Regions:
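Secreted, luminal/periplasmic, and some membrane-associated catalytic domains
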Residues: 2, 11, 70-101, 108, ...
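A structural signal for well-ordered alpha-helical segments within the folded catalytic domains
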Residues: 27, 51, 89-96, 177, ...
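Low-complexity, glycine/alanine/valine/leucine- and proline-rich hydrophobic stretches
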Residues: 402-448, 455
């Protein structure tokens, strides 16, 4: 019997519509898609890199994983927020299960992949890696071999939300080149039965250059010298993918997947500004004044005390009056709202009998927020218990997709209105969309359009090959 091999190529943040638009400039990808089982891949709720790739690898949804974004509450305290790592994924990944079966596996840059996990084969950590001084390969001694291939091996594009577009673009190409150089080295020199690789540079490209590409973007700039940044990069990426496919034999089963899509970002809505204005979040005025010794902006906010209305600040626990606060929020791709529940939070004030009515009232108010011109937004407010059969960890009480993720959530305060034109972490052109890409091909595959594939189904489909 022929040896069963599976190669999974992950492209972060690629929507099906993008590959369709670029069809003429990406011949290798187009050829693959036109001879495969292909369709949209519904992402997790929320559609964020972490937890989406972990769900793909384990078959477990964010509720089962206890991972609701890049930062997660680890305890009842107000400051118990921790960046996700591979240690947080307790469910076995497909490479864990295959390692247990004696299969040789290679995993490269699949988030959350730091610190590296022991496998029967090789594991190279992802963009969460702090730097070369840290252990980022398994086995550890492979690090020396990797650095001989790429002495300045990159894990990510640093500070990709910045006006430094030329620097970002240069680093995107460097990152991609180094990743594929490593992948090709593995394919040529190491034994494997299962290989999974994720390219994060596509996500960074979209965040930095989407407005130059997407004519529907509210800040579309077709005259910019970066107007071809996205199609040019995908032509380059396609050439590397073509070289990768040449290193695979015809008996290899190939998956092409993305964890979520991308779309134009229209701006940001201040979740904590909203909660303050509605009386749900109360700040300590004296502590607030102490925290205003920071770089000022030219903004004015009714949420800040008189004489200090020219600053944007983060809402840290020490400036919140918890004895008067019923809810607070965290910004990001989506808004996370936590209720200050008595008996759960250290200084909770919302009684059990008030908890559900407050959630419903907040949902009603959040869904009623219009855009800056008074137009209705398609805001979705989800309760974790409505979307996850099992809940572990500490999820938000409300998950808010402003205008179905056309707007980001802004956690900082100090703006003249609820609406901001830029992400509060830096210039950003795109937010995430729900559908990524799914394509599957083996020696028997006939071209087939598929609908309804969900990201948690991928791990089982991989295991079925063996």
């Amino acid at each position: 019997m022929a040896k069963q091999r599976v190669f999974v190529l992950g492209l972060d943040a690629v929507p099906p519509s993008l590959l369709k638009t670029l069809k003429g400039g990406i011949p290798n990808l187009t050829r693959f898609l036109e001879t495969s089982e292909y369709g949209p891949l519904e992402s997790t709720h929320p559609p964020i890199t972490c937890p989406a790739w972990a769900t793909m690898a384990t078959g477990k949804d964010p509720g089962e994983l206890g991972v609701y974004g890049f930062r997660n509450r680890t305890g009842p305290g107000y400051d118990h927020l921790k960046m996700v790592s591979s240690r947080d994924i307790q469910a076995p990944s497909v490479w864990d299960l295959l390692s247990q079966r004696g299969k040789e596996v290679i995993v490269v840059a699949v988030p959350p992949g730091y610190p590296p996990k022991p496998v029967k084969g090789y594991f190279v950590s992802c963009f969460l890696t702090p730097g070369h001084k840290n252990s980022f390969t398994y086995p550890e001694d492979f690090k020396e071999e990797l650095l001989k291939i790429s002495p300045k091996y990159k894990f990510d594009v640093m500070n990709f939300r910045t006006p430094e577009k030329e620097r970002i673009l240069k680093e995107i190409y460097e990152l991609t080149d180094q990743h594929f150089k490593l992948v090709h080295h593995f394919l040529k020199t190491k034994p494997w039965d299962f290989f999974m690789f994720t390219e994060i540079a596509t996500d960074r490209l979209h965040h930095a250059f989407w407005k130059y590409f997407d004519s529907s973007h509210p800040k579309h700039d077709s005259a910019s010298k970066f107007k071809d940044a996205i199609p040019d990069y995908y032509r380059y990426l396609d050439s590397l993918i073509g070289k990768t496919f040449e290193l695979l034999d015809d008996k290899t089963t190939v998956f092409l997947v993305s964890d979520h899509g991308s779309k134009a970002i229209h701006g940001g809505i201040g979740i904590n500004e909203f909660l303050i204005r509605e009386g749900y979040l109360v700040l300590k005025q004296e502590e607030l004044k102490k925290n205003l010794l920071i770089e000022p902006t030219l903004l004015v906010s009714p949420c800040l005390p008189a004489g200090n209305q020219n600053h944007v600040i983060g809402v840290s626990p020490e400036i919140i009056d918890w004895k008067k606060t019923r809810a607070w929020g965290e910004g990001g791709y989506y808004a996370r709202v936590f209720i200050n529940k008595k008996g759960r939070e250290p200084e909770g004030i919302v009684l059990e009998s008030e908890f559900e009515p407050l959630k419903l009232k907040l949902r009603e108010k959040l869904q009623a927020i219009p855009d800056e011109n008074g137009n209705t937004l398609d805001t979705k407010v989800l309760f974790p218990e409505e979307i996850y059969p099992l809940i572990t960890g500490i999820p938000p009480d409300l998950m808010v997709y402003f205008d179905n993720l056309n707007w980001r959530a802004i956690g900082t305060i100090g703006y003249p209105s609820l609406y901001v034109s830029e992400n509060d972490t830096g210039p950003d052109d795109s937010n995430h969309s729900q559908d990524g890409v799914y394509a599957f091909k083996n020696s028997q595959t006939q071209k087939k359009k598929v609908e309804g594939m969900k990201i948690h189904q991928i791990s089982q489909k991989i295991l079925e090959v063996y």
